[in-house]
From Swiss-Prot:
The gene is rpsS1. GO terms for cellular component: cytoplasm; small ribosomal subunit. Keywords: Ribonucleoprotein, Ribosomal protein, RNA-binding, rRNA-binding. GO terms for molecular function: rRNA binding; structural constituent of ribosome. GO terms for biological process: ribosomal small subunit assembly; translation. It comes from Bartonella bacilliformis (strain ATCC 35685 / KC583 / Herrer 020/F12,63). Protein S19 forms a complex with S13 that binds strongly to the 16S ribosomal RNA. Belongs to the universal ribosomal protein uS19 family. This is Small ribosomal subunit protein uS19. Pfam families: Ribosomal_S19.
Length: 92
C-alpha cells in the first residue's frame, strides 16, 4: 500500500544527521544504517550507505534513480541457492 502524499516520505531522524556529517567532512565513507524502512531522499545522492540485511551491512551507492525508493529494496535479506537437483537424474 502506498503512503499518503500529505504525510510526506518517512526517514529516521538520525539518518539525516549522519548524512550531513559525512557531507560536511568530505570523506567518502560508508554510513552504516539499520533503517531499511527509510525513504531515499535527494540529499542522499552520491553517498554510500551500509544497509543491514539481518546478517551484515550491504554497501549501497545512492544514485538519482533510487530517490523515492526504500533502502531495504537494495539489500536482499534472503539468499536463493536454487532448487534441489533431481534425485532420479543423480542415480543414473
Amino acid at each position: 500500500m502506498v503512503r499518503s502524499v500529505w504525510k510526506g516520505p518517512f526517514v529516521d531522524g538520525y539518518l539525516l544527521g549522519k548524512a550531513e556529517k559525512v557531507r560536511a567532512s568530505g570523506r567518502n565513507e560508508v554510513i552504516k544504517i539499520w533503517s531499511r524502512r527509510s525513504t531515499i531522499l535527494p540529499q542522499f545522492v552520491g553517498l554510500t550507505f551500509g544497509v543491514h540485511n539481518g546478517n551484515k551491512h550491504i554497501p549501497v551507492f545512492v544514485s538519482e534513480e533510487m530517490v523515492g525508493h526504500k533502502f531495504g529494496e537494495f539489500a536482499p535479506t534472503r539468499t536463493y541457492y536454487g532448487h534441489g537437483a533431481d534425485k532420479k537424474a543423480k542415480r543414473k
